[in-house]
């Protein structure tokens, strides 16, 4: 009797489609968090795309402009800083909130969301909403840093009233640093004109704009100063802690999780 021939077939498993949509994709901590999350999910078998109105995110992960985003009933939607029309129907809708007062959830109809993700306990307590929610910290980049010992300090983040950039400059110069590099975009021109421009004009501060390469940015400074009025997580502090960079500012005391831990928290939420 001839042996019976059997053929094994592998049935491909369709990847779950995740679409991250934000109304802000200029440089910043929130945009970096979304880029890192997109790459993390794609590395672990999801089909994830990050959509937004600006161009900065487009070459850093699987991404597209927001007008290319088509949502359907099989999609998992993660939305940030944007109100999605109620008539949009998806498999699951998660609100990813990085903000406090600029996006107060008590003023938003939260019934359309299946869950809400905060980045820290203090932020969740500030928002104080009675809805299903999780706390998932963002990925913190691990940066190699060598102290240039150059008497130059850095201030990282947008230049605006909330960041209190002028106080960071004043503290750094008062501590003996010769110059302060400002890595960030001017988001508040009146604030800049009234409080920061004088430091730039005197040569004590230099507008260094946003730097895409974190190792190049941190490698130019001997310390980092931070004076923000409100932080939900504190990504700059966390990056400095992991790299051993002197950080001068109020601590958020935030947990820093490994990528695998962060992925597992999202995996539990998406399924």
Predicted features and spans:
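Short alpha-helical donor nucleotide-sugar binding micro-motif in glycosyltransferases
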Residues: 210-211, 216-221
């Amino acid at each position: 009797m001839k042996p019976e021939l059997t053929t094994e077939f592998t049935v491909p498993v369709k990847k779950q489609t995740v679409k991250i949509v934000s109304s802000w994709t200029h440089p910043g901590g929130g945009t970096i968090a979304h880029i890192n999350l997109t790459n993390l999910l794609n590395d672990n078998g999801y089909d994830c795309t990050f959509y937004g109105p600006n161009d900065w995110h487009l070459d850093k992960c699987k991404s597209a402009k927001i007008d290319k985003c088509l949502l359907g009933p099989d999609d998992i939607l993660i939305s940030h800083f944007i109100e999605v029309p109620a008539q949009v129907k998806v498999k699951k809708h998660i609100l990813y909130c990085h903000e406090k007062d600029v996006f107060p959830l008590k003023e938003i109809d939260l019934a359309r969301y299946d869950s809400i993700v905060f980045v820290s306990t203090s932020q969740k307590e500030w928002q104080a909403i009675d809805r299903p929610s999780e706390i998932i910290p963002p990925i913190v980049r691990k940066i190699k840093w060598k102290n240039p010992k150059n008497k130059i300090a850095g201030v990282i983040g947008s230049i605006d009233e909330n960041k209190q950039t002028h106080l960071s400059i004043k503290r750094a110069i008062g501590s003996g640093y010769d110059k302060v590099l400002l890595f960030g975009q001017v988001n508040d021109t009146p604030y800049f004109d009234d409080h920061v421009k004088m430091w730039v004009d005197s040569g004590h501060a230099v507008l260094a704009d946003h730097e895409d390469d974190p190792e190049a940015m941190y490698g130019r400074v001997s310390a980092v100063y931070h004076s923000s009025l409100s932080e939900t997580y504190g990504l700059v502090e966390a990056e400095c802690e992991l790299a051993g960079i002197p950080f001068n500012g109020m601590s958020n005391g935030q947990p820093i999780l490994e990528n695998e831990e962060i992925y597992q928290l999202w995996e539990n939420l998406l399924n």
